[in-house]
């Protein structure tokens, strides 16, 4: 009897392995996508928390000028400024020179649809920083005084 020297896999074995891999990818891909988006939302929340802390810290410095005096949404123009101003101190604390550089760090789908961080101050001088709608649901990320965790 003649011995053959067959090495490697047959076509049927390769097709079975590819089919199993396709099934695994089909099952695991949606979970992976959810995980990635959840991590992006978490990163955006960390960024908003940094903005909140920068605003609060700068507002407590009595030597800075341009600290918001009225409650409501603070325009992005107020968040631009030179050294010695509230807006300049906020940007300096965040390590950027323009407000657009802060907005460009947003990564989540929520942030990409609105692409702008909103800073709001209440009558007691407490800050709320959010992107999207002002809540912590699928349509917004909020930190600070107005966050309904």
Predicted regions and their residues:
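N-terminal pilin/flagellin-like segments and related low-complexity appendage regions
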Residues: 61-65, 78-109
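Alpha-helix exit/C-cap motif
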Residues: 53-74
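Aliphatic-rich helix starts adjacent to a transmembrane/signal segment
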Residues: 32-50
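N-terminal single-pass transmembrane signal-anchor helix
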Residues: 6-32
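Short, surface-exposed interaction loops/tails
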Residues: 75-83, 97, 107-149
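Bacterial Sec-dependent N-terminal signal peptides
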Residues: 1-5
């Amino acid at each position: 009897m003649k011995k053959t020297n067959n090495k490697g896999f047959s076509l049927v074995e390769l097709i079975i392995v590819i089919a199993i891999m396709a099934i695994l990818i089909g099952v695991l891909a949606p979970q992976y996508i959810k995980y990635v988006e959840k991590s992006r939302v978490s990163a955006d929340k960390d960024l908003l928390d940094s903005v909140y802390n920068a605003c609060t810290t700068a507002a407590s410095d009595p030597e800075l000028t341009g600290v918001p005096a009225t409650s409501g949404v603070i325009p992005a123009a107020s968040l631009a400024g030179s050294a010695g101003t509230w807006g300049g101190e906020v940007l300096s604390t965040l390590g950027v020179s323009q407000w657009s550089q802060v907005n460009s760090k947003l990564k989540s789908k929520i942030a990409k649809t609105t692409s702008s961080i909103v800073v709001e101050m209440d009558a007691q001088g407490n800050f709320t920083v959010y992107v999207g709608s002002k809540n912590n649901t699928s349509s917004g990320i909020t930190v600070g005084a107005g966050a309904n965790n």
